[in-house]
Amino acid sequence: MNPMRDQPGSPYGDSTPRSPFSPFSPLSVDDRHRNHADTKTPRSPFSPFSPLSGDERHKSLAESKFQQALASSGQLDPLSPGSMHHGGHKFHEVFQMKQGRYDLQASKISEMMKSSSLDNAPTQSLLSVLNGILDESIERKNGEIPQRVACLLRKVVQEIERRISTQAEHLRTQNNIFKTREEKYQSRINVLEALASGTGVEHEIATQQLRQIETEKSMWEEKKKHEEEDMVKLMKQNDQHNLEISALKQELETTKRKYEQQYSQIESQTKTEKSKWEEQKKNEEEDMDKLLKENDQFNLQISALRQELETTRKAYEQQCSQMESQTMVATTGLESRLKELEQEGKVVNTAKNALEERVKELEQMGKEAHSAKNALEEKIKQLQQMEKETKTANTSLEGKIQELEQNLVMWKTKVREMEKKSESNHQRWSQKELSYKSFIDNQSQALLELRSYSRSIKQEILKVQENYTDQFSQLGKKLIELSNAAENYHAVLTENRKLFNELQELKGNIRVFCRVRPFLPAQGAANTVVEYVGEDGELVVTNPTRPGKDGLRQFKFNKVYSPTASQADVFSDIRPLVRSVLDGYNVCIFAYGQTGSGKTYTMTGPDGSSEEDWGVNYRALNDLFKISQSRKGNISYEVGVQMVEIYNEQVLDLLSDDNSQKKTLGILSTTQQNGLAVPDASMYPVTSTSDVITLMDIGLQNRAVGSTALNERSSRSHSIVTVHVRGKDLKTGSVLYGNLHLVDLAGSERVDRSEVTGDRLREAQHINKSLSSLGDVIFSLASKSSHVPYRNSKLTQLLQTSLGGRAKTLMFVQLNPDATSYSESMSTLKFAERVSGVELGAAKTSKEGKDVRDLMEQLASLKDTIARKDEEIERLQHQPQRLQKSMMRRKSIGHTDDINSDTGEYSSQSRYSVTDGESLASSAEAEYDERLSEITSDAASMGTQGSIDVTKRPPRISDRAKSVTAKSSTSVTRPLDKLRKVATRTTSTVAKVTGLTSSSKGLASSSIKKTGSTSSLAKSSKRWA
């Protein structure tokens, strides 16, 4: 049909989009002639058939091609992997990144020139290669092009010239095809004239001509399909232009950032130079020379920047002139081709008029040709209907083209606005350049003043040398400066400590705080193993069996508290960690140590304690309530408390209503959003510190406690207090979740020292086993092993999110200073030292955005639309079967006219459904693009990651669809494919914007139950959901 489509040497290939008005489009000569002949439809000013003057067409074409050439360097970069893969050749092996620029290697360029990679590459990629070479030459300061790059550029230009010549040959072949078609039409006219004789042989020839007309009808239908494909390609070009505009905006932003960075660097350099001048007054003459040299360097940099600006302007003007010359040549060729097509159209019109006159003469023939005459009239009516349909299709296509041209005008205005902005930026930077010059002049004046000041200082030094007493005063001043420096040393040391803590937080290390328990009244302080407690987290322990330096052992932690430290001092250091829970972080604080080392005192405080003796649990919740009240104008918080214990490897609920019979709880294999993986544990909402005290008292009363030889009230279980926080931003509607786990571990003990038997012995065995499992987990994390044994005990399963997740974790190491507990103290300190080296990774917050829900609703509506279109396709696919059955029955009778009427109704009905589907798909895609532009700007600030499991709905096409014609099947499925593209784009956008959908249910969806309480507060409270 069209030799351009099947031509293997076509420079554009099969994948490049072509305009239906391009001389290289897949439309035939008749199609272009018919489009040109239809003068009733409005033309766009950017069309080659526009009634504008020649100069205006030249200007418009030059502007459009210049914009496409500028955008091609950003859109289809020859160095990007996408364009290389499109051309089928590995151009990215030739260009390599080197310090932000493309380094062209001589060996690879020579290989590419010898091979046939340039012959098979698309023309657009060759133009982008040429633009990339020119851009790289502009970025260089000298503006020269290397020899190997010049050879490659010459090769690319020769390849483009060769392709232009091949395109001219294709035009000649099309002319030959048009001449052959004219000969065919002439032969048909001769056949119609021969029909006047009325012989039977001539009648058969006429029927053969009618068959040929039917084949041409099918060819027209195929040409319609090609036109629709061209429209789809034009839509893709529209999307590509949008991407090009966004790329230009990004480039402008990068240039702004570069200029601001240069400005900040110059300011920092000037500040450092000032400080050097003030400190080095004695060597002022040498420093003056250095400053003069730096001043010369600044002048050189300014001159270099001016040269670069001039080179860029010259290159820009050269490109403009080249593009204008190319567009002039192309427009002259198109105008000549248009004139030829108009002349050929006139010839065809004259032939058509002669044909119509001949048909009128045939109507006057005898009865023998009457049947053939009626058949010809019916075929002529069908052809007229086809012409009307093609005209309507052309009008719709031209309307769409006009819309696209309006979009191009809008984009051109946007580009002009961007150019104006760039000019304003250039003016602003020129003003900054003037300010820099004034600053340099001020510096030079300051240098002159410093010279005069240095001379005066020299005179003063001569006077000081003469006076002996003044020298002692100078020595005194120096001693004062040394004392000030010694005082500043402590401030610098505290700043370094703060920076180290921030570094540890970024790494995600487990912070370790060591607290030394004071001696009891009955014990003597002389037998202590603690030799020294430093302010920088240093702890020195001495071995009582090895006195002297050999028995000393030093440990380093984040913080070490002496026996005199109060509960308020301890909580002041962990307050920032606790407050981060309200920002959506998970925090875990647990106390570790041997029996009787003060773990419960640190976490809870003494029994019946006042507010001054409160432990970490009460103080943390009290601080959370205060902050939540201060933020209630912006964020509404809900706080819930959960308290469980692990007793003999069983998880029990400490806030359960039935105290006599505790219920054993299960642990889920996957952690929920509410922190602990124990959904059956009771959870109570709290609004004040008094509610927390009541619940804590209930939990402590239910906790397993026993007496041993080492401690009268020893904890025989691990208790975990979990505080769940849910916050909702009143302005944006975003939801955040935070969890605070406060763990009081049971103490490790030696059975021979604790003197336990029976149940207490079994309890001690379970406690030591769980603590040893915790040590195995810590050792695996410290060594970064691939397998971490979390399932070895219930304790490690519950602490899995804190030890292996993205949580902020802190461990209190409780130390018994008694000399009799030296071995237990050493094992505790070694364990803590190993824990401090574990890196968990940076903690991350959990937030849920409002835009995620909107996207999911929009995705559901698109799926419903696709389902409706699937049902409509199935309905349309059933109609051809019924038509075929009716045709088979009517053929036996001979009613062919009814069949034609039925097929006409079916084609019109399917055409109406297709147009409805196309309008629905286009409106859905436009709505999606508007929504996507609003959401992507908000999603960039959220910084969340994740994935959404969206199952694509497969198209439901039955096997009976094979009976449908090619026209109906492709035209019906086209709007459905468009809708599916919109749905898939929405799915990918949701997956990039958020990672919180799987965990967005929050505390509201957790299975939290309440069966009653033993206290008045627990009875009146409801379940927190």
Curated annotation (Swiss-Prot):
Keywords: ATP-binding, Coiled coil, Microtubule, Motor protein, Nucleotide-binding. Residues 509-838 form the Kinesin motor domain. The keyword Coiled coil applies. Residues 65-75, 901-913, 939-948 have a biased composition (Polar residues). It comes from the Eukaryota. Pfam families: Kinesin. Residues 1-87, 263-286, 881-926, 939-977, 994-1025 are annotated as: Disordered. Residues 203-425, 847-879 form a coiled coil. Residues 29-41, 270-286, 950-962 have a biased composition (Basic and acidic residues). GO terms for biological process: microtubule-based movement. GO terms for molecular function: ATP binding; microtubule binding; microtubule motor activity. Residues 15-28, 42-53, 963-974, 998-1016 have a biased composition (Low complexity). ATP binds at residues 593-600. One of its GO terms (cellular component) is microtubule. Belongs to the TRAFAC class myosin-kinesin ATPase superfamily. Kinesin family. KIN-14 subfamily. This is Kinesin-like protein KIN-14P. It comes from Arabidopsis thaliana (Mouse-ear cress). The lineage of its organism: Eukaryota, Viridiplantae, Streptophyta, Embryophyta, Tracheophyta. The gene is KIN14P.
